[in-house]
Amino acid sequence: MDPLQAVHLGPRKKRPRQLGTPVASTPYDIRFRDLVLFILEKKMGTTRRAFLMELARRKGFRVENELSDSVTHIVAENNSGSDVLEWLQLQNIKASSELELLDISWLIECMGAGKPVEMMGRHQLVVNRNSSPSPVPGSQNVPAPAVKKISQYACQRRTTLNNYNQLFTDALDILAENDELRENEGSCLAFMRASSVLKSLPFPITSMKDTEGIPCLGDKVKSIIEGIIEDGESSEAKAVLNDERYKSFKLFTSVFGVGLKTAEKWFRMGFRTLSKIQSDKSLRFTQMQKAGFLYYEDLVSCVNRPEAEAVSMLVKEAVVTFLPDALVTMTGGFRRGKMTGHDVDFLITSPEATEDEEQQLLHKVTDFWKQQGLLLYCDILESTFEKFKQPSRKVDALDHFQKCFLILKLDHGRVHSEKSGQQEGKGWKAIRVDLVMCPYDRRAFALLGWTGSRQFERDLRRYATHERKMMLDNHALYDRTKRVFLEAESEEEIFAHLGLDYIEPWERNA
């Protein structure tokens, strides 16, 4: 997900500490009129309650200073449902059966999403029906992070797309991306690891106490988390989003074929817009960059799943024309369950193909598309794979399989969707496609590597090296102690060799 699209960071306003009764509500626009919230001060404190009330109002929620008949939701922190009912009884207030008793994590998620989120079981405060409403050990539905030790390795964590901490991870992803654009490798990795571990948590962070025992959260990261808890936003991420260099590099590298070196050059030359770059006669562009500019509007828009499925059919139809027994697998984010992406990746292999047939397939397929008028751009990198070469020691090493970077013309009629991101008046869309051809005996390693996520693969290789004395890449797994290559016909076998529980593709969104 593009962090620029994923996070909404409003203006940061430092507030002095408040004492005493919370101030009256300020005249913010109420966007969600069906919900009337009351935030319970018990176990929360006056200052934090006042801050949360103010923040919720800024986000468009109606929050009452006092409990009244109009309240539909009571939100509490570190209280069980029984605690809340006991408090209501002490106030001589009878709770309506329609009144929702919710943990503060629900409101935090609402504010992160900018709208009310669905009330799940984990949000509902538990009321013990068999006793008077008093504190009952274990009855409250407040998540506890230290139930089980959390691994520092993403390959030992299950990370689905259900991110309870997006407010934090979006900010950390922006900071990581900024460091990557500046080639600050150490800081970038620290932010990426922190974001990755937060994405795996089955509960939302609502206070700094929740971060206790969680690995990969250094002092800098904890400071950022604390700032977001207090202010509802990250001043550091906001500063990056407003930074001219960051905005320029993001814009320039959004062009297919433009890397950091070219972006740096254009920035130093004083360019800030793509139109100025395209109109400058002194600049020379590669064929890839020319294609990137030509189809920019299509390529910069996300590919949705119906479009990816249509491309998958296009690829399979072409491949089996020349290799009927070939196996074509969609990899990358779409294999991990994502609904959108910036390109579509495919791994191709064949159990019966000769080495020559493997080497010729991508050439035949791209020639076939060229004859059909579907090939808008093509760059084939020939294989440099060596069967008995040990895996790379680098956790980010690229593989040596034959691969093809394409832009294909996807006709609107092939997409089974009401909306397919087409430009109005145009019957097709340019789609970025990567094809990888690998030998059949290496398919498991290639599939594991090309599925991602990037952080999952990095940690998988790091785990193999540091914990198992093995070397893993997209080609092979090598045991340095026994000095042998370990064969595998499936991803499950690779996990077994490493002594790891198998992680499904949709649980690798680290």
Swiss-Prot record:
Cofactor detail note: Can also utilize other divalent cations, such as Mn(2+) and Co(2+) (in vitro).
Return the PANTHER family for the record: DNA NUCLEOTIDYLEXOTRANSFERASE, DNA POLYMERASE TYPE-X FAMILY MEMBER
Reported EC number(s) for this entry are 2.7.7.31, 3.1.11.-
Q: Which organism is it from?
A: Mus musculus (Mouse)
An MF annotation (GO) of this entry: DNA nucleotidylexotransferase activity
Q: Does the keyword Ribosomal protein apply?
A: no
Which residue numbers delimit the BRCT domain? 27-124
GO CC terms in record = cytosol; euchromatin; nuclear matrix; nucleoplasm; nucleus
Cofactor(s) this protein requires: Mg(2+)
Q: Where is this motif: Nuclear localization signal?
A: 11-17
What family does this belong to?
A: Belongs to the DNA polymerase type-X family.
Region Mediates interaction with DNTTIP2, residue ranges: 151-510
Q: Which residues carry this modification: Phosphoserine?
A: S134
Start and end residues of each stretch annotated as Disordered: 1-22
Q: Which residues bind a 2'-deoxyribonucleoside 5'-triphosphate?
A: G333, F334, R335, R336, G337, K338, H342, D343, V344, D345, G449, W450
Altering D399A: what's the impact? Nearly abolishes enzyme activity
Entry binding sites for Mg(2+) = D343, D345, D434
Q: Which Pfam families match?
A: BRCT (PF00533), DNA_pol_B_thumb (PF14791), DNA_pol_lambd_f (PF10391), HHH_8 (PF14716), NTP_transf_2 (PF01909)
**How is this protein named in the record?**
DNA nucleotidylexotransferase
One Gene Ontology BP term is: DNA metabolic process
Superkingdom per UniProt = Eukaryota
Mind telling me which residue stretches traverse the membrane in this protein?
Answer: none
Q: Which PROSITE patterns match?
A: BRCT, DNA_POLYMERASE_X
Subunit info here reads: Interacts with PRP19 and DNTTIP1. Forms a ternary complex with DNTTIP2 and core histone. Released from this complex by PCNA. Interacts with TRERF1.
